[in-house]
Amino acid sequence: MVEGFYGAPWSQEARIRQLDFYGRNKMNVYIYGPKDDPYHRTPNWRKPYPAREGEELKVLVNRAKENNVIFYWAIHPGQDIRWNEEDRSLLLQKFESMYQLGVRGFAVFFDDISGEGTKADKQAELLNYIDDHFVKVKRDVAPLILCPTEYNKSWTDVEGGYLTTLGDKLNEGIKVMWTGDMVVATIDKSTLDFVNPLLKRKAYIWWNFPVSDYVQDHLLLGPVYGNGLDVKDDMSAFVSNPMEHAEASKISLYSVADYTWNMENYDSETSWKHAVRDLMPLHAEYLEIFAAHNSDPGQNGHRFRREESVAIQPALSALLKAYQEKNEIDEDAYRQVAE
């Protein structure tokens, strides 16, 4: 899981509950990278966390360990980074401060930026330096992760050589994230066949679902479907970016765990029903109805849609047809929808 959405970050209590949920469902990675944490990104990525915030992160790190979850802390320096020794040293100092809090997984995000920070050769040089002078030196740190600037196919300039440069220059053990053909998209074999040769490694999937920061007036509570069932050998990892609504996100995260642990036999509808019962066992029937009617983001700039109100679609279609063609109400269809 990657907490990488825009909007109100999760509370400390919500994160603790999430980590316990991951432990119960065998989700083994949590990447801390909320876009609205000022010490994660510009302007304060160079500064250590204040004592209170640092102690809260330490609590989360320890809770993650209790649940057999690798806690990754991500830094987002690209919007104002200077490619010089001073900033490189400040970045390592920040990582060292996080290491002292117990963090043993680190990521560097260069997504959603412009300007000097987007240069692939400079990014690769920095990541290799971190890998050589921090990750490998510590010897107890998980593989370094990079979220690149061109992180989906629609934004990739193949002729410009950005991804090829990363593939050629990055140390072999560094992981590179990818969201698919678009910012919000399902993951299939074709998108991995496209990106893996460029990166010269298996992509680390950042799946932008059920994140809803691009449709903040919607909840995405429906089944998790559409990802390939034949891609487990073509990716190095798979993490989901959730909604700012932590508890509601658990419906999808439950199914993401199902999908990643048993991809070939994954059944989206069965998993969704199990997720609903797991989240609200005493009122699963009511939550299932609510979730079934709150699953589609509606029209959006990413052109990502989901099925919604599937059980009553025939009745809705009949109602619409009767009204459009005869300016009347189909009573049977109306009764089905009302029930």
Predicted regions span which residues?
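Short, well-ordered coil/turn segments that N-cap beta-strands
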Residues: 26-28, 65-71, 102-106, 140-142, ...
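Hydrophobic or amphipathic alpha-helical targeting/insertion segments
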Residues: 90-107, 111-115, 129-133
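Feature activates predominantly on carbohydrate-active enzymes
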Residues: 1-87, 94, 100-104, 136
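Conserved beta-strand positions in the central sheet of alpha/beta enzyme cores
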Residues: 31, 107-109, 239
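Catalytic-core regions of glycoside hydrolase
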Residues: 4-5, 113-269
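Amphipathic alpha-helical segments in well-structured domains
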Residues: 57, 88-91, 120-127
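C-terminal functional modules
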Residues: 261, 265-339
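Short beta-strands and strand-loop turn motifs
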Residues: 73-75, 107-111, 146
